[in-house]
Amino acid sequence: MRKRQNYMNVKLGICNFCVPGTGVFAPQIVSEMGLDGMSIEFGSYEHGWALSQKKIMDLYLDAQQKYGIEYPNIGCSDGDNVPFYTPQGDPMYDAVQHWVTKAVDAAAYMKIPMVFFSNFNASLADTEEKLENTAKRYRYLCDYAADKGIEISCENPLSVEKQLQLVEMVDRENFSLFYDSDN
């Protein structure tokens, strides 16, 4: 398939999980669709966070070279199922800490500039306590990611006021809000 003509220096991509045949063979499909890149999904707790495995990262990197596409970010949608704001002392705290730091490690290894976390459903910060714990985890992540040159982003359905409050609470240069017009 011929690549589309790009008159405005705009790049078009797609989320990995929106491609028929997700996973490490999605880059080929994305390339054949004429797109420039795709967001990679980090994976789920139930399936061992696939992108935390070096073999899977290497397969994606090989496909990236072979098909000439970009990976602008790693998406961590498991926040829909695993509470991102889990506080210290909670039985899930260590698992969540492992998940979020491994996502940053994967981005550093793969030279992907952004990791975004989905804060919907199980991760919705709908109380002040949850919002504070969410901000605390984002501060940790931003500090962990800063020397690796990784931006940390948050996708959530909070009101504009609550999102701006979160930005103020995190207060890190490498923190941003991620917007998906489909949510």
Predicted features by range, described:
Residues 1-7:
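Short, Lys/Arg-enriched N-terminal segments with co-localized hydrophobic residues
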Residues 3, 65-70, 83-177:
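Active-site acidic/histidine proton-transfer and metal-coordination neighborhood
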Residues 10-16, 38-40, 71-76, 115-117, ...:
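Hydrophobic faces of well-ordered beta-strands that scaffold small-molecule active sites
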Residues 17-22, 44, 156-161, 182-183:
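Short beta->alpha connector loops
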Residues 23-44, 110-111:
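Catalytic domains of carbohydrate-active enzymes, especially glycoside hydrolases
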Residues 23-24, 53-58, 97, 101, ...:
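Structural motif corresponding to alpha-helix initiation and N-cap regions
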Residues 39-64, 119-126:
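Glycine-rich, proline-tolerant flexible connector loops at the mouths of alpha/beta enzymes
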Residues 77-82:
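Aromatic-lined carbohydrate-binding surfaces of glycoside hydrolases
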